[in-house]
Amino acid sequence: AFAESLKKEENLHPVVVFEMETDDSWARDVAPTFLVNRTDGKISDLTAAGNGTAQTGDDVKNSQVRGVNWSFNAWGGEVDGLYASYEKDNAFAWNFCRKFEFDCYDAEPFVLEGGSIHSDGEGTLLVTESCLLSAGRNPSLTKEQIEEQLKCYLGVEKVLWLPRGIYQDETNEHVDNVCAFLRPGEVVLAWTNNQNDPQYAMSKASFEYLSSVRDAKARKLIIHKL
């Protein structure tokens, strides 16, 4: 009913509902990351962008959009993955792009989930060290090599590495539930004032880090605690 109501709204793209078989994941983590050639000739990450301010509907409609297919191993594979059979989940992004006829960059065997990255759409990417440097993701790659992969496939210029995410998050502390861009140059950070809460030290470390860095446009970040 909700989808049908959206179809009646003016100036909205048609809503398409389709079914695709998976193992045990959600689209946020296994779907393709979409990129669009911006009007200034640069690449922008659509899927991870905080609020879409970098691109208007017309920009996207008149630009070339492509997907990125990452490798998915149930958040850790044989090291600390959450389930053993994830072939359908791993094929989701590729099958999605094929169904809707999007060109797709194949980043396999580089392991990444959609929830582990967050972009401002202007060249800056948020990630957590606890997730992207975990032993179950890309253990043969150094931090510098992982960053180069992100820059290559996402077109970003600067990667901001938060030390931790949310306490006991089973995804090795994805960035998507601890910090997000409200708009370029402005972030919201999960916070607690309870110093006895394990999350306090984790969020405090991220706050101190974010306070010390600048984004790809050399802006000092505005940080909102939530």
Regions found by a protein language model. Name each.
Residues 1-51, 55-226:
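The feature marks the mature, well-folded catalytic cores of soluble enzymes
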